[in-house]
């Protein structure tokens, strides 16, 4: 085995973790303020100081999660992704009351537009405080999709120059990267070991002026370890496969127990429908205490997860905070 295969990251335990959904595909202000177990799932309030505000949290096809870690008297905050539009994330952070000066890093899970859309705006909101952007080099490349009738459509591109600001450190890496004083690691390129998680068959990437099939090597996520509970694995879209991602997190941390799996599982669309049951089979084997499918998991797959893992399932909605 080479050094990459023997990789083991020095992930530190956290006492607790909070994950707040800034942007997701779904919003529902009628959900109960807390749900069993009430200490873990809390919704954004419908009314503030006895009044329903005239404005509302926005939902869009995208993802942005605020992750906070707590260890003794030490607290760290970071974002995973920044949604699609330039509007949704800044608007929701203001409504939720996020103190942007405390955000230490933004991790971009991969270079698709529904994950980097408001990055420039977030960095402007954080200024003049310093912040790092952790990102795979491929996230800056031109992407495209092949449509059913053969047409090729180009995706928006994240321009590196748009995020080159005096307060921003751009960390381009293909490997796991330490954040939050070692309490969070971005995963880097995820090993693909399952025989059924095949990425996006219609995805293309431009290299040296030519489009080629895109295995979306930049797809990754976050891993944390809660003392006495186990790993928390958060995915952006899980183009690498949600099972692959969890198993890779287990491998590089040396921790087998999984407490929570959260994020987009990319089971949307007809080409992924056939993978839903197999994916849930494997998730049942992993047996997390909590599972929170979001974003590109799709309505049908989310409902099947709820049916097959009813005790572990948590419904996500914009503004929800999960206290782990």
Task: Outline where the language-model segments fall.
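Zn-dependent metallo-beta-lactamase
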Residues: 1-75, 186-217, 222, 226
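Short acidic, glycine/serine/threonine-rich loops at helix termini
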Residues: 33, 144-148, 273, 305
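Pre-active-site segment of Zn-dependent metallo-hydrolases
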Residues: 54-61, 69-105, 248-252
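Divalent metal-coordination and catalytic microenvironments
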Residues: 67, 81, 93, 110, ...
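A structural motif corresponding to the C-terminal end of an alpha-helix
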Residues: 68, 162-170, 227, 286
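Active-site metal-binding motif and surrounding structural segment of the metallo-beta-lactamase
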Residues: 87-135, 253-260
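Cap/insert and terminal regions of metallo-dependent hydrolase folds
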Residues: 112-116, 132, 212-318
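Metallo-beta-lactamase
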Residues: 138-220, 314-324
């Amino acid at each position: 085995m080479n050094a990459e295969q023997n990789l083991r990251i020095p992930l530190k335990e956290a006492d607790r973790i909070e994950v707040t959904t800034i942007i997701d595909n779904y919003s529902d202000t009628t959900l109960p303020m807390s749900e069993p177990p009430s200490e873990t799932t809390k919704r954004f309030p419908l009314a503030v100081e006895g009044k329903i505000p005239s404005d509302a949290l926005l939902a869009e096809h995208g993802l942005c999660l605020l992750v906070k870690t707590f260890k003794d008297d030490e607290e760290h905050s970071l974002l995973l992704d920044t949604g699609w539009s330039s509007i949704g994330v800044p608007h929701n952070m203001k409504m939720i009351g996020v103190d942007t000066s405390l955000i230490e890093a933004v991790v971009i899970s991969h270079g698709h537009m529904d994950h980097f859309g408001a990055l420039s705006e977030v960095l402007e909101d954080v200024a003049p405080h310093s912040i790092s952007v952790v990102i795979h080099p491929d996230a800056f490349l031109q992407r495209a999709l092949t449509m059913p009738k053969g047409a090729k459509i180009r995706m928006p591109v994240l321009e590196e120059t748009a995020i080159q600001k005096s307060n921003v450190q751009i960390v381009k890496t293909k490997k796991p990267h330490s954040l939050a004083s070692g309490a969070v690691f971005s995963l880097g390129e995820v090993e693909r070991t399952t025989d059924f998680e095949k990425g996006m068959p219609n995805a293309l990437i431009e290299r040296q002026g030519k489009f080629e099939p895109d295995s979306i090597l930049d797809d990754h996520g976050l891993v944390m370890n809660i003392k006495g509970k186990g790993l928390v694995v958060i995915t952006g879209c899980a183009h690498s496969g949600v099972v692959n991602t969890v198993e890779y997190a287990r491998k590089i941390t040396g921790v087998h127990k999984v407490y929570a799996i959260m994020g987009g599982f990319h089971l949307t669309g007809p080409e992924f429908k056939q993978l839903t049951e197999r994916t849930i089979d494997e998730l049942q084997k992993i047996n997390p205490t909590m599972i929170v499918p979001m974003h590109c998991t799709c309505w049908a797959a989310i409902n099947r997860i709820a049916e097959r893992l009813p005790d572990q399932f948590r419904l996500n909605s914009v503004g929800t905070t999960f206290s782990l």
